[in-house]
Regions:
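Periplasmic peptidoglycan-binding/tethering modules of Gram-negative envelope proteins
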Residues: 1-51, 59, 63-64, 129-131
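Periplasmic OmpA-like peptidoglycan-binding domain that tethers envelope proteins to the cell wall
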Residues: 55-131
């Protein structure tokens, strides 16, 4: 995902294959290569500082999606925290990482009339804070 991309402060990159189980903050196994690519990027660029952004689709009256694992409306935050916790567990320093959940407030597609559009709204992005 990061091969050949020039990184710049302020840049946001969508982690294309970061898939979670529906209504949960648990990552699906097929997403591990994407997660490992992010880890490899951080290990190769020791000064890289990132912010992890979680997004969900289909929110109605609540600002964030419902997380069945925590019985709370913090799904996007918990998904971003899942990535954060994994990176910390793999030795990336906490000073290089932060995370935020945006719920459904920053949709790529406000019209979520089909599954393709909804799927693109359910995403994890990283923002390059500094190099």
């Amino acid at each position: 995902v990061f091969d050949g991309k020039k990184l710049e402060a302020g840049q946001q990159i969508v982690l294309e294959n970061m898939l979670f189980y529906p209504g949960r903050h648990i990552l699906r196994p097929e997403s591990l290569p994407e997660l490992h690519a992010l880890l490899k990027l951080l290990r190769a660029n020791r000064n890289l500082v990132i912010e992890i952004h979680g997004h969900v689709c289909c929110t109605t009256t609540e600002p964030d999606g419902y997380d069945w694992d925590t019985d709370s409306h913090d799904l996007s935050l918990n998904r971003a925290r899942f990535i954060y916790d994994y990176l910390i567990s793999m030795g990336i320093g906490a000073k290089r990482l932060s995370y935020k959940g945006f719920g459904g407030t920053q949709k790529i597609h406000p019209d979520e009339s089909d599954e393709t559009l909804r799927a693109e709204n359910r995403r994890v992005e990283i923002k390059i804070v500094s190099l």
